[in-house]
Amino acid sequence: MIHAFIKKGCFQDSVSLMIISRKLSESENVDDVSVMMGTPANKALLDTTGFWHDDFNNATPNDICVAIRSEAADAGIAQAIMQQLEEALKQLAQGSGSSQALTQVRRWDSACQKLPDANLALISVAGEYAAELANQALDRNLNVMMFSDNVTLEDEIQLKTRAREKGLLVMGPDCGTSMIAGTPLAFANVMPEGNIGVIGASGTGIQELCSQIALAGEGITHAIGLGGRDLSREVGGISALTALEMLSADEKSEVLAFVSKPPAEAVRLKIVNAMKATGKPTVALFLGYTPAVARDENVWFASSLDEAARLACLLSRVTARRNAIAPVSSGFICGLYTGGTLAAEAAGLLAGHLGVEADDTHQHGMMLDADSHQIIDLGDDFYTVGRPHPMIDPTLRNQLIADLGAKPQVRVLLLDVVIGFGATADPAASLVSAWQKACAARLDNQPLYAIATVTGTERDPQCRSQQIATLEDAGIAVVSSLPEATLLAAALIHPLSPAAQQHTPSLLENVAVINIGLRSFALELQSASKPVVHYQWSPVAGGNKKLARLLERLQ
């Protein structure tokens, strides 16, 4: 049978009540206990789950409904649960030692007075009340993150349209994850700082993408959630467009990564055009969409979270290196490789980056010869007639490198350093000497940038790390792969043109939060030393929305 009682005028968040429900369900002579606020949606849930009691007809959204399933008919069971509930609520009010300093208020005005620099409202109340609170936040020029779900599509469109008109951002509804300016919002991870700005219409998608970025040794600037419906045909990607504009204006976000559930096709095209407008290297992952091309201008398409993370990290490293070098903006690329397969892959990759065709005939080891860009395989038979392979004797390559001193139109030199048994004792040292001769023969305004990969292991006779150190100490850029080497070379010759720099939005510089709903979110922000005020909201006028709006206007 069901025992029941109501605790009047004691609004609590749903997570706290679920925890209390589990604790009370462990009581003696009790099968199960359900503790919920008396909202219409919760009453319907109590009915469908078999916990309904007619006493709940008198409950308002500010009242706690307690339903106890027990085989015993003893009325004292309800009394015992009532006492335990009072104790649980008392402990909740007192909180832990870390929560005693949490600033708590019961009115909007008080929240804004306590935190005058507030620029974000984090809303996690029942969906039927969330939209009204979000509008009130927009009234106060606050950005909004709506963790709440069960918000109508019409309300979402209205809120996001209004926010965009005001130059604000609405994340959500049903937005579970954001990490902005180092501030963890709802479900978030502690991320290393980097130069990748993340946008997502998928909470766990953002978390997995960011986790993979961290595992690869890179970091993020921000991760902006949108809510799962943002890229639907009806919503039209309103918040996605705002987020892209915000990160476009953020100097620290040099690379962008975007992940979403399957979008409407018209919206996808609109978002891709907005990505292009940023001018920044951008990785786009539209789950369920198979791109016709791997790259469209400054937009790289991925087909999985793992691939998106790897691409973002690759672009992150390339962009950081490119920005650390004086722009070339013209000139040609020359690749002098000792390994045939390495030369072939480098040629194919570079041809794709430059929009040219790789050489099909490979005459005299010429793997690429287009628009004055060349990739040559010096291990080709043409170069080994009467002389050792260049991995054994690097004399020929070193001479060709030195000869580049008289070819100032060549601005970027691609190289491989292959070590191991059979290879020359110190290929890096002889390569550095040849490159330095070429550089010395040029004018100061005619630099020759060198980019190298090293093939081999730490246990090889030449020692991988020692070879890398020799190259880097001389000023040669050492990268981990041919895709990174060729992409960096192309980026130096043909750099992307970011959109005109704008002022970084204040939200991306510092986040100060008015938390409305789940107390745990405020405690987590406090533990992260982020400015937060907890607004202990409860339904106004007993949940009567018309009367609540009237009272709001009278204030």
Curated annotation (Swiss-Prot):
Temperature behavior of the protein's activity: Optimum temperature is 30 degrees Celsius.
Enzyme class: transferase
Keywords attached to this entry: Magnesium, Transferase
Cofactor: Mg(2+)
One MF term in the entry's GO annotations: succinate-CoA ligase (ADP-forming) activity
InterPro entries: CoA-bd (IPR003781), SUCC_ACL_C (IPR005811), Succinyl-CoA_synth-like (IPR016102)
Catalytic activity: oxamate + carbamoyl phosphate = N-carbamoyl-2-oxoglycine + phosphate
Coiled-coil residue spans: none
One GO-annotated biological process of the protein: bacterial-type flagellum-dependent cell motility
Signal peptide start-end: none
UniProt GO cellular component terms: cytosol; succinate-CoA ligase complex (ADP-forming)
EC code(s) of this entry: 2.1.3.5
Transmembrane segments: none
UniProt keyword annotation of Magnesium present: yes
Gene deletion effect: The deletion mutant cannot produce oxamate during anaerobic allantoin degradation. However, the levels of oxalate, produced via a glyoxylate shunt, significantly increase.
pH dependency: Optimum pH is 9.0. No enzyme activity is detected at pH 6.0 and 7.0. Activity increases in the pH range of 8.0-9.0.
Induction text: Induced by allantoin under anaerobic conditions.
Pathway: Nitrogen metabolism; (S)-allantoin degradation
General function of this protein: Component of a carbamoyltransferase involved in the anaerobic nitrogen utilization via the assimilation of allantoin. Catalyzes the conversion of oxalurate (N-carbamoyl-2-oxoglycine) to oxamate and carbamoyl phosphate.
Other noteworthy facts: Oxalurate could not be used as a standard substance due to its unavailability, and the enzyme reaction was performed in the reverse direction: the synthesis of oxalurate from oxamate and carbamoyl phosphate.
Description of how the protein assembles with itself and partners: The OXTCase is composed of 3 subunits, AllF, AllG and AllH.
Similarity-based family: Belongs to the AllF family.
Protein name, per record: Oxamate carbamoyltransferase subunit AllF
